[in-house]
Every structure is written in structure tokens, then in C-alpha cells.
């Protein structure tokens, strides 16, 4: 997101600061992030590492203590995978499910990563009146029949010149990809280096609840168990696209594995 953040900063005239993170910082923060979150959910951990390091930099390098964040827009207006929703009813049910589970995934990430760095969040999309209004809209209007996900949200900002059109109509990218595709790839490669195939199979069999299904998920689970032994049921389930929908039966939570990802994240 670096180049897009620069574009927005130049457009609105904001004081722009960039935070770079290294592979060493990603790995060195992994245990802290898992302990902080109290989860072994794959996508929550991936996304939290970037947010944790950014919030840490804000705390250490600035006097800013209150942040605006964009959580809950996905739950209300759709993820990349909700392009596959078969109809409005299915979209609405999925949206309701995601809102009910906010505290276990996206809001868990934002709350912990921000507060541990002595910062506060303001979440405009979480305004109760706004949430009630959006959830009361005809869900058929939220289906991606416009060739662009989250069309209603984009359309709301189309007038007034709040954002350049290149940003407003940009393809949606996976959250953890916004800090760089290489971060997720690096985490996967690191996990692969920690276990042989035989070790992976035998260690996974130790867990009957929410059994790890990749070496990355096993790595996160084993770190989780060092801090929260025998408390796996703290996590209800892995965050994943709705596997009952055509096109969503995938084994990784990242939108990058979906057939409709296209130019997203470029």
C-alpha cells in the first residue's frame, strides 16, 4: 500500500510518514503477537503483525495517541470472497455472521494491537447507527453486480472529491497483503523450514480440536499452546471464506487464493 498511501497523502495534503518492516522484525514479533491476541487463527495473526509494528512505531516516534481505523467495512459491505455469494439472502446471512464474530477476528486484532501500544482507536464504520442502517439495506444492492466490490461504499464517496478516482475505484486487496505480499510468503516459508512432512503429520495429530492443516497453522498453534496450554477452545474456528459457496472451497484464508483476485493488491 506504500504507493497508494503516498497518492492519498499528496492528494489531501496530509503529513505522511512511512514505516518499513524487515523479515527479522516480522519473526521477532510473532510470539508477542500471538500471546497478545490469544489466538492461533491464521489470517488474524498475519494481519496483526503489520498493524502491531505500525502502532509500535506510532507510539515510539510520534505524540499521536488516537487513530482512525477502517475496521468493520468488510463485514458490512463485503470481502473479496463475498463476490461469490449466490444471492442477497446468502450475503446478508454471511454479513450477520461476520458482525457477530467481530470480537474474535478483525476487532480483536485492532483492539489488541492498538491498545498494547497505548493508543486509542476511533472506528467510524462501527458507529451503531451506521451499522444498523447498512444492515437494513436490501442485500441485493451489496452483491458485486457492478464489477467492483463494496460498490455502495465507493459510491458514497464519489461526490465531493474526497479521494482520487484511482484510489476510490482500486481493486480490493487482502489486508495482510497491503503490507507486502512477501510478508505472508515469508511466514509460510519460515513455517515450512521448521517441520519435515513427517513431523508436521505427527504433531498435527496431537490436536483433536481445530487441528492444524498447514505448517504455518501448526507453527501458530504450537506458539499459542506455550502461552495458553489446553485452551484451544478460546478460538471458535479458523476464519475462512464460506466453503459452501462455489469458488470459496480453499485451504488458505487469504483472498490471494481466490479465482477473482485478479489485479488486486498490485
Task: Kindly label every feature range from the protein language model.
Residues 1-161, 175-190, 201-203, 207-212, ...:
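ATP-dependent adenylate-handling active sites, centered on carboxylate activation for C-N bond formation
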Residues 193-194, 198:
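C-terminal catalytic/acceptor-binding lobe
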Residues 164-171:
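A short alpha-helix-loop-beta-strand transition element characteristic
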Amino acid at each position: 500500500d506504500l504507493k497508494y498511501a503516498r497518492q492519498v497523502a499528496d492528494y489531501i495534503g496530509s503529513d505522511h510518514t512511512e514505516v518499513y518492516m524487515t523479515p527479522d522484525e516480522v519473526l521477532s514479533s510473532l510470539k508477542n503477537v500471538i500471546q497478545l491476541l490469544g489466538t492461533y487463527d491464521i489470517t488474524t495473526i498475519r494481519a496483526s503483525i503489520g498493524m502491531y509494528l505500525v502502532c509500535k512505531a506510532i507510539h515510539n516516534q510520534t505524540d499521536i495517541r488516537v487513530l482512525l481505523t477502517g475496521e468493520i467495512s468488510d463485514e458490512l459491505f463485503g470481502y473479496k470472497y463475498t463476490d461469490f455469494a449466490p444471492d442477497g439472502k446468502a450475503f446478508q446471512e454471511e454479513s450477520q455472521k461476520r458482525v457477530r464474530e467481530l470480537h474474535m477476528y478483525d476487532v480483536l486484532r485492532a483492539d489488541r494491537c492498538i491498545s498494547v501500544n497505548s493508543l486509542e482507536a476511533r472506528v467510524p464504520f462501527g458507529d451503531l447507527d451506521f451499522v444498523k442502517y447498512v444492515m437494513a439495506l436490501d442485500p441485493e444492492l451489496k452483491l458485486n453486480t457492478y464489477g467492483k466490490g463494496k460498490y455502495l461504499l465507493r459510491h458514497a464517496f464519489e461526490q465531493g472529491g474526497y479521494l482520487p478516482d484511482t484510489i476510490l475505484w482500486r481493486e480490493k486487496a487482502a489486508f495482510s497483503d497491503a503490507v507486502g505480499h512477501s510478508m505472508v510468503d515469508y511466514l509460510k516459508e519460515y513455517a515450512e523450514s521448521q517441520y519435515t512432512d513427517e513431523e508436521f503429520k505427527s504433531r498435527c495429530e496431537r490436536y483433536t480440536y481445530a487441528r492444524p492443516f498447514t505448517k504455518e497453522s501448526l507453527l501458530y498453534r504450537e506458539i499459542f499452546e506455550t502461552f495458553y496450554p489446553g485452551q484451544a477452545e478460546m478460538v471458535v474456528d479458523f476464519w475462512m471464506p464460506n466453503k459452501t459457496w462455489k469458488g470459496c472451497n480453499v485451504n488458505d484464508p487469504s483472498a490471494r487464493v481466490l479465482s477473482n483476485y485478479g489485479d488486486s493488491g498490485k
